[in-house]
Amino acid sequence: MASSAPSSSSCTFQAESSFGPAVASCRRAFDFTLYFEEVVFVLVPSCVFILLAATRLLFILRRARRFTTATAATTTSTDTSSSHSCGNAAQNQHTPIGHGLAHHHILQQCTAGLLVTLHVAGLILLCTTVPSRQRTDLSVPASVVAALAFGVVPVLAHFEHKRRRPSSGPRSSSLLVGLFLCVAVLLRAPLVRTHAALYGSGSALVAVEIASLVLQLVLIAVGEVSSWAADATSNFSPEESAGFLGRSFGSWLWGTFVTGYRTTLSLDSLVPIDSSLESRIVATSFDHILPVSPSGKPGKNGQYRLLLALFRSLGLYALAPVIPRLCLAGFTLAQPFLASATINYIGNGPAPDRDGYGLIGATFLIYTGIAVSTGWYWSLSYKNVTKIRGGLVDGVSQKMLRLSQQHGTESKVLTMMINDVYRITSTLAYAHELWVAPIETAIGTWMLCRHVGPPGLVVLGIIGVCLGASTYVGKHMAIQQGVWLAAVERRIGATKKMLASIKAIKMMGAGPSVAEALERLRRLEFAASRKFRALIVGTLLSSYSTATLAPVLVFGTYIGATTAAADFSASTLFTSLIWISLLASPLIQLLQIIPSFGAALGSLERIDAFFEKQEFTDERDEATAVDSSCSEKGEKKKEHVSLSIHNSSFSYTDDSEDSILKDVNLVINRGQHVVVTGPAGCGKSLLLQAILGEVAPQNSGSRVCVDGKVAFCSQTPWLENLSARQVVSRFSRDKDPSWTDRVVDACELREFLEAQDPDATIGSQGSALARAIQSRPDILLLDDVLSPIDYVTKKRILRQLFGKSGILHETGTTVFQVTQDHAVAQLADIVLRLDETGALRPYQFPPSQADVEDENGDVDNGAENTRPRESSHTTEAQSGPPEPKSKPTEITDRKVYATYFESIGFLNLVLFIGGGIIFAFCLKFPNVWVGWWTADSSDPDEASHNIGYWFGIYAMLNVLPLIAVAGWVAQLMMLIVPLSGSKLHRKLVDTVSKATFSFISRVDTGSLLNRFNQDLMFVDSRLPLDLFNTAAALLTGIAQVILIGVSAVYVLASIPVLAAVLFLLQHFYLRTSKQLRHLDLQSKAELHTRLSESYQGLATIRAARWQRQVHAEFQAGLDRSQAPVYLLWTVQTWLKLVLNLVVAGLALVVMGAAVGLHQHGSSSGASASASGIGIAFLNLTTLGETMTNLLTAWTSLETTLGAIARMVSFSRDTPAERDVLVRPDSLDHGGGGGGDRAEPPESWPESGGIKLEGVWATYDDDDESDENTDDSGGRPATDVAADGEKHEATTITTTSSTMTTTRYALQDISLEVRPGERVAVCGRTGSGKSTLLLALLGLVAVRRGRISIDGRDVAGVPRARLRGAVHVIPQDPFISVASGNGETIREALDPAGKLGDEEVTDVLQDCGVLDKIVGAGGLAASVSDEALSLSAGERQLFVLARLICRAGGRCRHGGGGILLLDEATSSLDVNTDGKTAEVLRKWLPNMTVLSVLHRLEAALKYDRVVVLEGGRVAHVVTPSESTVSSDIFAFFGRSRSFLESRETGGVSWLE
């Protein structure tokens, strides 16, 4: 290169050797120097790429070694959740790379190699054909570094292809390679242009460089089509196989969009998402968010421990959004410079055409850069928060499995999983705005000061005040959010109780009172959230303060501080306003985020406090660790001890001073069968909990030891939402089908399994028992699991399980069970009894109760021979046909919006819309005023008004938006939110409470609870803000487009095109986004169900050590949930990208038209004004953000409205009970009295007579449908086999268009119960006993026949009136849902206050629960479960006492009535059960009683015994008849001598 020359030679080649950056115009117009291009366009990107590529290669090699080690370890383990793979589990499979990818990789390597060859050739040509005087000092070094950089490309691509993690998908080209190639093409093109100008366009060097550019484009295209070559490996994520451009412009989402547009998406049809989001990978990264040693105290890092742990878990991925966010900040801050240059270009007269073309090019680069960098920023941010969501939800599930079962834990877990995790993730998505906002503020303020001087610093004061206010609000918001969520937890807990007890509630007619209790809790919830909502109003008000007040204060200070005439030219005013707008627009969002961060920190504190909870500790493990034997030290080991308890006392709570079980000593040898009995509330279940380790001993020196694998079956069976087949075998690792068959047969499940629909989700107690035995335990713990089963079935199960030839005896299983059943006790090796003092003593049942045949079961066999085994097609727990496979009703957007607007009221809707219009007008009209101001001030000599006039009105106009937004948001948050939330909650409660019993009993409880939890959370917290943001952005955007069109008239021509593009975009986008949001809600409902089910079965899961498998299955469900969550976020990111590209197109139209008019306007007479361009750019700078905010808020609004759509769909799809079964005027009584047509009197039923005439009942929902009948008198035809056995209670009715199959649970039942009579209803499981009670209450469909009470057909009585008139004690006792809302025990027992305190106390004393009530605090104590702590038997006694208190006054004074008992004393011992009959006779002497039971001793106390079989009446006998068939006694397993012994014993069993 030539040596130094004087400055006069700037037009020689020496000018190319300077850094420039611009070269002298005498050499080339509008170009950079060669030296600058070699440094910035070649050396810098090449060196950065080489450095990053080396780092990436090192990472790949290290990861490959780790993966090889992990794979070797994994292949030796067993996949515990293979049978439960779902959703995106396919992405976990290591599918080999197909031939298409192999060929693609070869093509890529060949192309890259050829590209390297061309760069080497170019280097040689540069050195040989270009003289040194025409090269800079960096020409050759830059070419060498560039050749090295391109030489790294095939190496990196090869290792990305060969050394990647197999589950990460087919990456034939890395993002780093794609990014480098794209940048290289953009930067090398100007250098090739410069070389062509310097060395000639026909030179060999330029030809090689052009070929190199073309080959780079080819290589980019090859990398982008890698996903097409991966069709054979469709299990991989298309995102991971996409190239850089595909990721930048979201082309990998096209498959999802097309599928969603053409068909219906499902969780199984979604494309696999990024493998880094798999739960197993996320759980590994986030494993340290759980404290290592929970102590129940806050961690050492305080409230930020969990937040820091989350970011530490993300590692370097937490910093991934930094680079695109900095790029976005740079492009955004370039807009004022572009606007200023454009205004000056328009206002300064003629200019070279190249300046206009440069402005057009700059517009393209700036706005396209904003679009692409925005897409990358949000894509990486959403990926991080998706990982955080997975880590938190997984952590909550893990922690739940480690905690003891305590009241309120379940509702707390469900609230955290939905509400808290949502708040955290939706807030942390904006985490990077916190650090970038100060940078943008500093730069923006500095640039503002360059235009207006020191007055520009005023904006910092406004920002400081607003930030201080937001920080203050954020701190208080976390506190108020905790108060609100505590109220939510109380409501969710009460709702869970309601849903779990829906059968009992409907039977008791307690629906209205329960609904009112839930409504009361809902009102308390809104009262608790009032301050939180007020803080939101303050937050939104402060967020808009910067945008409205900053221009006023800045310009006011500028006017006051300027001594000379202030410069109010269009360039100064609009450039300043653009800077203020760029400062204020992100601050509006930031100031809303800061309080949200306060709320998110509150949620993090709640979850962290949950993580810090003291975990369940198994004291048995410590004992076993000391001594592997369960024998006492020093004791001679004659037999192997399986279970032992030494000197231990137990209570349900650690802080209880009095022990329920005292000084328990127990030693059980292997293979023994031990039975424990005792009165209700004595602590039998507590003893089982102690053996399981769920309850720790209270005294020192105690020892609990369990030696062997344990299985536990609780009194309330733990049944998941699975079929009976899946329940039995889901935890079994035993692949021996013969063992499964033996277990199924022993538990009498064969016929049930064969008859059940494979897809039905109906389990049974027998399924839970079979699951426990299927796991081959060494010790089997049973908590009264056989009490609901009829005696005949029970005898078979006992013989096949516990008899000498039973499978448990064969396997040597130690059995420890709690029961009140003497039939079970007779097969036990040891019988123990717990008394009221908590002492455990040996026990022997009285002879009258132990008079049972031997295990060969003579009477049982007789019963089995005389009575064929009924088909199990109709079961006692029949809940109708399987849940419908059809999709929910499609709800249109119009219906959804109509439902929501109806909930807020017409007046509120009009006020809300009006407030939004006023706000948008007040917010944007000041821009128009500034345009008039600048136009008037352009010539000071001709100004019509002074500055004070213009500025004063401008100041007033900028204050009006604050007033408007304050009233607008206050109306929304303080009036609309509680009003709509209350109405929608009531709609949900009414839908559930009024649903038909057959429908609501088969709907998944978790799905229902999710509607009361997540859906209402959306309605309360997310929907109002989304509605506000959508309305504000929509109205503001309309105002901005109008201002752009008015200010630049030529832009109006593009408005129709813009509208068409937006319409097509939303039409195409919304079809997919709507489905994704529904799948998001659906998958969260599944997680809801999984967590709820797992919590209910914690004791069972921990007993059998199933935690790992349950957690693995939960992770599979979490993967299903992560897919729609992440895809919904990614399609929203794609929408932001496209909208910013639309804004880029609009900006190009504005700029192109302005440049064109400026260049050619003088000849045509048209021109663009500086003030018009200023207004246009002032709105263009924020239009992209406004449109992004609009579509983001709109899509979020669509998501939240999806919750309302689910409510509407649920309401439509849920069949509701008719108030009256048939119209009273259409009743055909066949001679019945006409009194049925009138409303029954308040005293009805007065006597309590019941009559059933030819009743056919079914669980089918269509109870009002007419049905064709046969020729046999209108009764449905019944299949009868040749031997006379009714194999199926089924009738098939054929019409001209359809064929329906109806399964009848009751068939031709005719029975009359006289007033005051007490009738026992007995029968095998599935015989129709409970169905008979349900038919009396109108809970099942009576298709034929008539049921009357006191001569009145119940078909004409409103159902609520019917259930309110009949007293019911259900099998599952229901006390109250409204725990914690102030209801006392006195109010729960006698809400009407009919009895005095002494009478209530007497009732409690007679029912045997007075001591428990006194211990809870007396009649004035809360009725909550945690306060009462009643056992299952005590709950039944409490319900009995409540019934007596509510009905006793009337019955004791001569009134009658009807009492239905559905296994109401199944959890009581025989003695207590006998006392309940005496209590009923004492307090309800005139009551007609119809009782479903299984015990003969109880049945013999009734006036008559009705035996049902196969839905028909088999026997109706009175115990006093000497001609009673022995069949009735055979049913109970008693011989005829039993009756004789009772009679000869001088005992009047009728008493």
From Swiss-Prot:
Coiled coil location: none
Compartment annotation: Membrane
Record-listed ATP binding positions: 678-685, 1323-1330
Region entry Disordered, spans: 843-889, 1219-1296
ABC transporter domain ranges (all copies): 645-861, 1287-1535
Composition-biased stretches (Basic and acidic residues): 1219-1228
Domain ABC transmembrane type-1: 326-599, 910-1199
Gene Ontology CC terms, in alphabetical order: membrane
Biased composition (Acidic residues): 1259-1270
Membrane topology: Multi-pass membrane protein
UniProt name for this protein: ABC-type transporter phomO
Annotated source species: Diaporthe leptostromiformis
